[in-house]
UniProtKB/Swiss-Prot annotation:
Source organism, top-level taxon: Bacteria
Gene Ontology annotations for the cellular component aspect, listed alphabetically: cytoplasm
Signal peptide from the UniProt entry: none
NCBIfam families noted in UniProt: tsf
UniProt function note: Associates with the EF-Tu.GDP complex and induces the exchange of GDP to GTP. It remains bound to the aminoacyl-tRNA.EF-Tu.GTP complex up to the GTP hydrolysis stage on the ribosome.
Molecular function (Gene Ontology), one example: translation elongation factor activity
Protein name: Elongation factor Ts
Annotated family: Belongs to the EF-Ts family.
HAMAP family: EF_Ts
Gene3D superfamilies referenced in this protein's UniProt entry, alphabetically: 1.10.286.20, DNA helicase RuvA subunit, C-terminal domain, Elongation factor Ts, dimerisation domain
Xref: Pfam families: EF_TS (PF00889)
Keywords: Cytoplasm, Elongation factor, Protein biosynthesis
Chain segments carrying region Involved in Mg(2+) ion dislocation from EF-Tu: 81-84
Gene name for this UniProt entry: tsf
């Protein structure tokens, strides 16, 4: 039977697929639009499964926070290209995933993928987006903070870096300032108490060996090591770092002056720890550095 251009257009609007694919599906289903949608869906999902093996190291960090400011989420959602990560379909999907993570309070990623988004579970919705966009899409990870009295603040830097801070005492502006600092300075933990003992001992052993090469007496070496170890700890901990907006004081001093304490923080960066083409990554980092 003859397939009208209007019918092809309707199928394209419903599936987001190409013109020739839509026309072929309509021919196979004798012009039955609903049957063609189902056929396209089946074929699309099959293609999506094949695409799921591709590296998805681009994407965005999405954030949502409750109206009372006591809970929030960060979610990393990956795509294969930055172009797709900026598309309306991808951004709407990411916003929906973040909303689910905040409202449904899933315990882990598996539970999140079972939550309902637009009438279907998130796992199926993800596959359908893969079929529509033509790239591997992955909901990689999420974190949720929630408390009855503490302030939760978030900071997003260009959608590629996301930070969430839970603050005891202080106010929302302070919490946001601390979140911005974490985005820029990348502390490993809040304070020395949170640093694994083996990390400190390993660094101390390295510093001792370096100091002994100076040939100085042991008591001098001990002082050298203690000074350098303190510097190392300050560089790694949030409270020991100079505050980015006022380097004359540390974050710890800033918090103390406000009668506040950071209960916890998390920092996400798109694609960290994932395989990525080296030349593209280097160019992107340089471009970000020039633009910041």
């Amino acid at each position: 039977m003859a397939i009208s251009a209007s019918l092809v257009k309707q199928l394209r609007e419903r599936t987001g697929s190409g013109m020739m694919e839509c026309k072929k599906a309509l021919v196979e289903t004798d012009g039955d639009l609903d049957a063609a949608v189902e056929l396209m869906r089946k074929k699309g999902l099959a293609k999506a499964d094949k695409k799921s093996g591709r590296i998805a190291a681009e994407g965005i960090i999405a954030a949502k926070r409750s109206e009372d400011g006591h809970s929030g989420v960060l979610v990393e959602i990956n795509s294969e290209t930055d172009f797709v990560a900026k598309s309306d379909d991808f951004l709407a999907f990411a916003d929906g995933v973040a909303r689910l993570a905040l409202e449904e309070k899933p315990e882990d990623l598996e539970a999140l993928m079972a939550c309902e988004l637009n009438g279907q579970d998130l796992a199926t919705a993800t596959k359908e987006l893969v079929a529509k966009i033509g790239e591997n899409i992955q909901v990689r990870r999420f974190v949720r903070y929630g408390s009855s009295g503490n302030t939760v603040a978030q900071y997003l830097h260009g959608s590629r870096i996301g930070v969430m801070v839970e603050l005891e005492g202080g106010d929302e502006q302070l919490a946001r300032d601390v979140a911005m600092h974490v985005a820029a300075s990348k502390p490993e933990c809040v304070s020395e108490d949170d640093m694994p003992a083996e990390v400190i001992e390993k660094e101390k052993a390295i510093l001792v060996e370096q100091a002994r090469e100076s040939g100085k007496p042991e008591e001098i070496i001990e002082k050298m090591v203690q000074g350098r170890l303190k510097k190392f700890i300050n560089e790694q901990t949030l409270v020991g770092q100079p505050f980015v907006k006022d380097p004359d004081q540390t974050v710890g001093e800033l918090l103390k002056g406000a009668g506040a304490k950071v209960a916890r923080f998390v920092r996400y960066e798109v694609g960290e720890g994932k395989e990525k083409k080296e030349e593209n990554f280097a160019e992107e980092v340089m471009a970000q550095a020039r633009g910041s």
